[in-house]
Amino acid sequence: MIEKSKKIQSDILTFINKYKDHQTERYESDFNQLVMRIFAYQFQNNLPYKKFAQLRHKNLLTVKNWREVPLIPIQAYKELILSTEDINQAADVFYSSGTTNINHRSKHYISNLNIWEESMRAGFKKNVLPNTDKIRILSLFPGMADNPNSSLSRYISTAIREFGTENSHIFFENNQLNYSELIVALQEAEKNHEPILLLGASFSYVHLLAYLQQHHQSFNLAKESIIFDTGGFKGKSKEVSMTDLYADLESTFKVTREQIINMYGMTEISSQCYDRNLMDHSENKTVYFDKIAPAWVKTQVLDTETLQPVAQGQRGLLAYYDLANWDSCVSILTEDIVIKNNHGFTVIGRAKGSVAKGCSITADELLQLQ
């Protein structure tokens, strides 16, 4: 098992580095072969997932390609331990925020951080910083030191370590955002015409904008600056439309919509999707704001009732096939409703009511999986 695990990890890293910038004619075949190997490994070493697959009459003989790999509902990460490796030897474990029930959170065991970090670096470089290697990063969200079991906090700490200049800084410490120090840093960057990457969760910006408005402050950021946003308003007491949020960011920081990028990620997956606008702009293409997946991730948009792929322009549940999830579940059915289009996908919101129930695991199934 150990040797097979090492070989799979090595081949995933090779795949990421081979296809992170462009795809060749062998890409589809290579992706399919690797997914099938990962599925076989998970079927043999992740017992709850094996039982789940068998309940759906899926096994190593019946699954013929990556589209047929059984999609584990994302809710399962709350109910089950989904790992091919010994969780006592895990390099890290990520917990979801648990905004509604802190004792009922998703848990994602990461046996080896090499693939997680390589996936993060490759995706970030291509989609966020296509034209530069380093930038001053100002974070509104805590890093690993203050939030050790958060995948987003590890993401932020990794971004600063790999892509941040020496004067990059995390301004969220001791459970609060240090507005005064952040404003000093923003004023300094404005004065020196220094490009910055302002990085935060969606709700962080709501609080920051309210504070700046209250104190009658705004900034004229350098034109190469980027505002990086992730998440949404799930479980928050106040919700703001993303259109309104981005309009406020544009006016407060004197940036264009093309300078604002949103990242799609979650605890249960190991790779992220991004708005494509910065990449499109860097390649002198028509700029779109749809989300795209990296080469080591494939997505499908599935009908909420039949779970069959929808046509272009239709909405459905997002299915996520992530090679970097080699040690848990390679294929996940999210609860996010998205629209499929020619340039990627657009997130509409979370599934609700009967739709959410339809993409979850029943209590009876849970008893059989444990």
Predicted regions and their residues:
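Domain-scale activation on soluble regions of proteins
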Residues: M1-D21, L55-N59, R121-N127, N147
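Active-site glycine/GP-rich loop and adjacent strand/helix microenvironment
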Residues: M1-I16, S29-Y41, K134-R136, N149, ...
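Long, charge-rich alpha-helical interaction segments
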Residues: Y19-H22, P73, Q217
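Helix-loop segments that flank and shape redox-cofactor active sites
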Residues: H22-D30
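Active-site diphosphate/adenylate-binding microenvironment
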Residues: E25, Y41-Y95, N103-Y109, E118-P130
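Internal, well-ordered alpha/beta segment that forms a basic, Gly-enriched binding/recognition surface
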Residues: T99-T100, Y109, W116, M120-N175
